[in-house]
Design a protein with these regions (language model features):
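Hydrophobic face of amphipathic alpha-helices that form TPR/SEL1-like repeat modules
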Residues: 90-94, 116, 121-125, 143, ...
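TPR/TPR-like (Sel1-like) alpha-helical repeat modules
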Residues: 141-143, 186-187, 261, 277-298, ...
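Intrinsically disordered, low-complexity regulatory regions that flank or link repeat-based scaffolds
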Residues: 1-64, 72, 76, 350-354, ...
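TPR/TPR-like alpha-solenoid helical repeat scaffolds
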Residues: 153-161, 194-202, 274-277, 302-325, ...
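Short helix-capping/linker turns of helical repeat alpha-solenoids
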Residues: 79-82, 110-116, 125-127, 132, ...
């Protein structure tokens, strides 16, 4: 069975997606470290807290847990527990109380590398303070350059974030070369304990830079995919489909795309919907498109947070699905014909991604769909 011929809708490997909307460093979660524990782990170590949960299950609500954790941390701070200072700031941060978190982190930044890292995130993203990319970059550099063993687990995440800053020219002079160097450091030869996002972004970088280096792109997407990155798993599917950086292999492509789609990669779902439509597997096409055709723009941030996929690719996937779902409804392919619903989903595709919808419509006019 032949794979579909490439269309203009597949720009993910041919268009630089990082020069548009400014990325947020909060998308890179604070790395875990054996030197530290989370607020919940810290609280659970105390028998008093455990017993309270057991005896009063009616109080086991989020608000009550937060209040209890803050009281417990306050007690530990009084005893001189240095870790409790950071955990209180982190709890503020996770609850969205950014001004309180900023104040707490600034108080302990000279003694706590995780607080320094979080200050870098907050100043860069403008959380609890005015956006100050330069200051955010300075804090990240402090983490990256620190010789202290307690900063070691933060270095890959800091390097990844600094790479993004250099790539986007935010807080520093734009430099793709420096971004690449930092991402390679952060990716650490595919180490699963390093920054998997750096591994994935290298795959995207090498497939969009000029000249393209598709073999490198395939390598890094493979590393990231092996470490659980859904974005790269979908990208590998496309690379196998079109023989980019690897020999064309439709079976491997479909395997990657189905796995990625099953775990929530919306763009992979969109590619599969298009594939099933072109191969005239209309029942399958509709079965897949039904799953996400009713997603809305406001769902994108939540999906991005859950799947760790880039919002722009989620947007494209949703637009593709809406377009092909509309086409099936318009013609009664694999579903009862309904022109009113078809019009709704065509409009939705245009609203989600006007450029992509226009290109798909152009292909339709030229009878390539």
């Amino acid at each position: 069975m032949c794979s579909p011929t490439p269309t203009e809708s597949h720009e993910s490997l041919n268009k630089n997606t990082h020069c548009g909307n400014r990325m947020q460093l909060t998308s890179e979660k604070l790395p875990k470290n054996p030197f530290y524990a989370s607020g919940s782990q810290y609280a659970n170590k105390h028998q008093k807290f455990f017993q309270w949960r057991k005896e009063k299950p009616d109080h086991y609500s989020h608000a009550n847990l937060v209040d209890k954790a803050l009281k417990l941390l306050k007690e530990r701070i009084k005893t001189g527990d240095a870790l409790a200072y950071f955990l209180r700031g982190q709890l503020y941060f996770e609850e969205g109380w950014y001004e309180e978190a900023l104040e707490q982190f600034e108080e302990i930044a000279e003694k706590d590398h995780q607080a320094t890292y979080q200050l870098g995130v907050m100043y860069y993203d403008g959380l609890g303070t005015a956006t100050n990319a330069e200051k955010g970059v300075d804090y990240m550099k402090k983490v990256l350059d620190s010789p202290c063993p307690r900063a070691r687990h933060l270095k890959c995440a800091a390097a990844y974030n600094l790479g993004r800053a250099y790539y986007e020219g935010e807080g520093v002079k734009r430099s793709e070369e420096e971004a690449e160097r930092l991402w390679l450091f952060a990716a650490d030869n595919g180490n699963p304990k390093a920054s998997v996002k750096a591994q994935s972004i290298l795959g995207l970088y090498y497939s969009t830079k000029e000249p393209k280096e598709l073999e490198k792109a395939f390598f890094w997407h493979s590393e990231a995919c092996g470490n659980g990155n859904l974005e790269s798993q979908g990208a590998l599917g496309l690379m196998y489909f079109y023989g980019q950086g690897i020999h064309q292999n439709t079976e491997a492509a479909l395997h990657c795309l189905r796995e990625a789609a099953e775990h929530g990669n919306v763009y992979a779902q969109g590619i599969l919907v298009e594939y099933y439509y072109k191969m005239k597997f209309f029942t399958k096409c509709v079965a897949f498109s039904r799953r996400i055709a009713d997603y809305e723009v406001h769902d994108i941030p939540r999906i991005a947070q859950v799947t760790d996929c880039l919002p722009e690719f989620i947007n494209r996937g949703m637009a593709m699905v809406s377009f092909y779902h509309a086409r099936c409804l318009q013609l009664g392919l694999g579903i009862t014909k309904d022109e009113a619903k078809a019009k709704h989903y065509y409009s939705k595709a245009c609203h989600l991604n006007p450029a992509l919808a226009d290109k798909l419509h152009s292909l339709l006019i030229r009878q390539r769909i």
